[in-house]
């Protein structure tokens, strides 16, 4: 059988994304035939014994597919969380619940909107790797009005615990006569855990609601709350399309599409 890189083998087993597999290898959590694995090491599926955190990994013949879900608030993006009342995988229809899927770009428990689930480790890696431009758009609702004069602060960002948190674009939605609004349209290419919430909090604003309504050119519209659909090849490609609106000023009337 053809030798494959160990991070690819782990990702294709459905355990996690390739990036997560690489991190596990670097952390010393992956072993091949009882020996600590090295990044880039090749293994022979079906012959070499690979374990991750003590769990044996086997190559699985499962279809490569990608799903998109309209995640509701209160649901955790995790394959297993002993403290969570409900995870995003609990919402899957039976036909997909049996597959080993993982999130390619999570949303925190209090946020809602588009989440990509996939069994394709290569796709997940492509979606999450910082070298790829994947534009994510968010509707942000605040407890208090945000003035237009402070939008540049969102673009410059802030440094919290050594990490630079920022957005690529930010526009007010339905600004009032004083050029302020409690609603914003925000674009990001990356997205660390709770980054948008932390950024607004650092600037003195409390996020009331956060919804990811677009990834690339794939929009939330038409997908009901808790709804799941399989993405076609064309729709998968659309995740990597940079929307025209990303390059120009926008004055959207609403992003409450569902």
Spans of model-derived segments:
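Basic, flexible Lys/Arg- and Gly-enriched helix-loop patches that mediate nucleic-acid binding at interfaces
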Residues: 1-258
């Amino acid at each position: 059988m053809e030798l494959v890189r160990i991070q690819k083998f782990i990702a294709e087993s459905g355990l996690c994304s390739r990036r997560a597999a690489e991190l596990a290898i670097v952390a010393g959590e992956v072993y091949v035939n009882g020996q600590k694995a090295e990044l880039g090491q090749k293994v022979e599926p079906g012959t070499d014994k690979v374990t991750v955190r003590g769990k044996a990994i086997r190559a699985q013949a499962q279809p490569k597919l990608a799903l998109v879900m309209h995640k509701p608030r209160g649901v955790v993006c995790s394959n297993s969380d002993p403290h969570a009342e409900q995870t995003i995988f609990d919402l899957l229809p039976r036909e997909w619940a049996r597959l080993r899927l993982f999130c390619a770009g999570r949303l925190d428990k209090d946020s809602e909107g588009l989440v990509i689930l996939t069994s394709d480790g290569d796709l997940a890696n492509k979606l999450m790797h910082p070298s790829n431009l994947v534009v994510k758009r968010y509707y942000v609702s605040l407890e208090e009005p945000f003035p237009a004069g402070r939008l540049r602060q969102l673009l410059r960002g802030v440094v919290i615990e050594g990490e630079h948190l920022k957005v690529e674009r930010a526009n007010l939605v339905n600004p009032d006569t004083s050029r302020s609004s409690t609603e914003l349209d925000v674009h990001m290419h990356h997205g660390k855990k709770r980054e948008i919430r932390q950024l607004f909090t650092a600037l003195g604003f409390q996020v009331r609601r956060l919804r990811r309504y677009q990834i690339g050119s794939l929009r939330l519209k038409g997908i009901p709350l808790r709804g799941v659909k399989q993405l076609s090849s064309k729709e998968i490609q659309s995740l990597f399309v940079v929307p025209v609106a990303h390059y120009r000023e926008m004055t959207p009337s609403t992003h409450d599409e569902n």
